[in-house]
């Protein structure tokens, strides 16, 4: 639920979250959709300005209905930010918290090319959520990107997939950058999987469709490392 939202869609979410009479209607539809499509649960991916008044109440109410139907609830949160409007009760309601340890730079920072998702970024995210916020590692998963950013232009930064880099040259599978194109290759993914295996419950991927569907697959790299 959520993710990248247009301004009009964002307003709809804000209105639902703030309205205690409308929230139950939305929640019932989410639960029914999950059941109709044989889903395991819901990931609440409302980010930044979309975390508004009513968010915590929504999460707590949604959790109650999902749990009653044996469905799980997770959230995707920035690597080193806890939104001030999220209460401790709401935070504890999630079965897992997915740490989005990527997008440390991107199109919004075109003049400063660099890695958007390094091992150090991942380590910082784990430290923040475990040691500063105090979430048990058993409830945390580490987000890894199957995409990167192209900083070859000083004015326009575009994203690209790991799969496209491997298609260009299989040697790119074991690199983290080609010129000013930055991404995660297999060695860095292995290091991140090791970090996750030692300190938390698993790996979250954004997103599977960006992988290389060959012997150089990052998903296969994750499976082999685990």
Specify the residue positions occupied by each region the protein language model found.
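Substrate-binding cleft of extracellular glycoside hydrolase catalytic domains
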Residues: 1-42, 46-49
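Acidic glycine-/aspartate-rich tracts in secreted/extracellular proteins
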Residues: 3-6, 145-149, 209-211
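Soluble non-cytosolic domains of exported or imported proteins
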Residues: 17-25, 49-57, 116-123, 183-190, ...
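Short, acidic/polar
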Residues: 18-36, 79-90, 183-197
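Substrate-binding surface in catalytic domains of secreted glycosidases
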Residues: 28, 48-170
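Active-site and adjacent substrate-binding regions of carbohydrate-active enzymes
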Residues: 35, 45-73, 77, 188-226
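Receiver (REC) domain switch/active-site residues of two-component response regulators
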Residues: 40, 95, 201
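Glycan-binding loop/region signatures in secreted carbohydrate-active enzymes
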Residues: 137-199, 220-226
């Amino acid at each position: 639920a959520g993710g990248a939202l247009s301004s009009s869609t964002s307003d709809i979410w804000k209105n639902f979250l703030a309205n205690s009479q409308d929230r139950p209607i939305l929640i019932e539809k989410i639960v029914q959709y999950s059941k109709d499509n044989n889903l395991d649960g819901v990931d609440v991916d409302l980010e930044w300005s979309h975390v508004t008044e009513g968010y915590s109440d929504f999460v707590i109410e949604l959790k109650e209905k999902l749990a009653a139907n044996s469905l799980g609830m997770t959230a995707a949160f920035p690597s080193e930010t806890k939104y001030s409007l999220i209460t401790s009760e709401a935070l504890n309601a999630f079965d897992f918290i997915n740490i989005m340890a990527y997008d440390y730079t991107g199109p919004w920072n075109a003049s400063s090319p660099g890695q958007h998702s390094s091992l150090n970024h991942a380590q910082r995210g784990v430290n923040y959520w475990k040691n500063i916020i105090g979430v048990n590692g058993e409830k945390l998963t580490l987000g890894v990107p199957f995409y990167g950013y192209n900083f070859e232009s000083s004015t326009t930064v575009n994203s690209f997939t790991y799969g496209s880099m491997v298609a260009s040259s299989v040697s790119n599978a074991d690199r983290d950058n080609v010129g000013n194109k930055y991404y995660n290759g297999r060695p860095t993914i292995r290091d991140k999987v090791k970090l996750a295996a030692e300190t938390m419950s698993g790996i979250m991927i954004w997103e599977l469709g960006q992988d290389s569907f060959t012997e150089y697959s990052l998903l296969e790299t994750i499976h082999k490392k685990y």
